[in-house]
């Protein structure tokens, strides 16, 4: 979503499926986002996101357009243009963690299944991926800790080649301060490298929010 991107790509704090367990109202929450990606380099790459939450379930649609590309033959002659894209459909669910048959109120567990469709013009691939998340609510009375493993599953081959999933271990924390400030940090550990995002949000009487963040890989 736009907010998580501005705050340094804080996906766990906003989309950890375990957070669905904390949704106690019966309302349907709908969010829309449009984000331009690498806007200082290209002007046609970005994604649209739609999210729906109700009770302990969430539904999402992500469409990523990678921008216009040139299609060439073996001699390098341009034969046309195309726009590769990815579509991701997701369903998430959250619940309390059980320990020895008893519910642990401060810990939630969640799962999200995703159907992924890549369209690379001459080649297409699809697959099924799974995210698993844990949420520890207000550790020591103030720290919200999120843990997750993301993008584990199966993708079909493209032209006989295996497709690597961006599987990762995700660790994040969120510290609310006096109902005005929120501090975010998240680390994403991939095979051979990692990324990190941090952000801060200021809430003015629940009427106006100022968000800032930084992301590096």
Locations of the language-model features?
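Subset of outer-membrane beta-barrel
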Residues: 1-217
């Amino acid at each position: 979503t736009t907010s998580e991107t501005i705050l340094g790509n804080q996906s766990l704090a906003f989309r950890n499926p375990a957070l669905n367990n904390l949704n106690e109202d019966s309302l349907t929450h709908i969010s829309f986002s449009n984000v331009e990606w690498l806007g200082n380099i290209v002007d046609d790459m970005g994604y649209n996101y739609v999210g729906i939450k109700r009770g302990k379930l969430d539904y999402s649609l992500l469409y990523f357009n990678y921008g216009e590309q040139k299609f060439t033959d073996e001699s390098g002659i341009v034969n046309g243009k195309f726009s590769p894209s990815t579509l991701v459909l997701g369903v998430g669910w959250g619940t309390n963690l059980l320990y020895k048959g008893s519910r642990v109120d401060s810990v939630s567990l969640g799962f999200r299944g995703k159907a992924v469709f890549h369209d690379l013009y001459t080649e297409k691939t699809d697959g099924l991926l799974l995210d698993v998340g844990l949420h520890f609510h207000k550790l020591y009375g103030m720290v919200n800790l999120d843990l997750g493993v993301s993008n584990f599953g199966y993708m079909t081959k493209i032209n006989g080649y295996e497709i690597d999933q961006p599987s990762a271990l995700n660790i994040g924390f969120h510290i609310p301060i006096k109902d005005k400030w929120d501090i975010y940090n998240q680390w994403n550990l991939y095979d051979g490298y990692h990324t990190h995002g941090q952000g801060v949000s200021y809430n003015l009487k629940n009427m106006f929010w100022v968000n800032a963040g930084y992301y590096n890989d």
